[in-house]
């Protein structure tokens, strides 16, 4: 099974409506997918795969042709100075540093504002380039924010957005296996204990993104119009297009 894979079809939005099924998907990276898994993915008819990883993260085989999807790799990354220093410190940094979700919060604060990746994503949503899939490495942070923005655009409640985001707690074993292959085994206990925010999701982190949107723009409608050029009229049309009566 492809890690952290799911769709948001069926989730409730305003007006006693739900997101239509078979349109918006999310997952972790596809590099480790088996041929059988890729064949199942191909059956979904996904036209576009947004890959929010940095170039250096794209180490494995790119299987997008096998699923019949166009691959758009647009990094959705913010350079968090503290985390950048830890990365440069290599494996030995794990012995001396311990991070909390608060150390990751600056990344979440900056991601939804002025981000070229999400601007491209919203343009695709408006232009109807669906079905689409969003992914990064674990499919929990950058892809998580992308899916959250789509849900907010379509009128999902705060509770629905948070609940969907928190489903990514299930991806922890996958992340541990990926990181475990990239660092010496002797450092595994330190990595898993000292860098826990890299392995799971925190409600407080998505709250950081949502609070930044509201503090900057006042409401989501203004955010979508100012950041992405999606007016109230266009948003209404998108809700009609991508949702249906429950």
Which role fits each region the language model picked out?
Residues 1-133, 146-246:
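Cys-dependent protein tyrosine phosphatase-like superfamily
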Residues 138, 142-143:
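Ser/Thr-glycine-rich phosphate-binding loops at phosphate-binding pockets of nucleotides
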């Amino acid at each position: 099974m492809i890690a952290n894979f799911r769709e948001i079809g069926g989730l409730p939005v305003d007006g006693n409506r739900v997101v239509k099924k078979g349109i918006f998907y999310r997952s972790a990276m596809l590099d480790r997918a088996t041929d059988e898994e890729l064949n199942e993915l191909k059956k979904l008819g996904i036209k576009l795969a947004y890959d929010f990883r940095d170039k250096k993260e794209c180490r494995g085989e790119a299987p997008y042709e096998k699923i019949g999807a166009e691959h758009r790799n647009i990094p959705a990354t913010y350079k968090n100075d503290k985390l950048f220093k830890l990365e440069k410190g290599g494996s030995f940094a794990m012995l001396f540093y311990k991070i909390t979700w608060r150390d990751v919060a600056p990344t979440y604060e900056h991601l939804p504002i002025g981000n070229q990746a999400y601007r491209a994503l919203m343009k695709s949503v408006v232009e109807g380039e669906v079905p689409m899939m969003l992914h990064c490495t674990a499919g929990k942070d950058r892809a998580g924010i992308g899916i959250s923005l789509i849900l907010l655009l379509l009128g999902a409640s705060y509770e629905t957005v948070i609940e969907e985001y928190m489903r990514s707690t299930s991806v922890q074993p996958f992340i541990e296996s990926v990181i475990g292959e990239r660092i010496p085994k002797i450092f595994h206990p330190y990595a898993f204990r000292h860098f826990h925010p890299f392995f799971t999701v925190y409600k407080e982190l998505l709250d950081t993104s949502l609070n930044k949107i509201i503090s900057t723009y006042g409401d989501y409608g203004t955010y979508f119009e100012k950041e992405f050029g999606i007016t109230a009229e266009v948003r209404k049309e998108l809700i009609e297009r991508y949702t249906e009566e429950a």
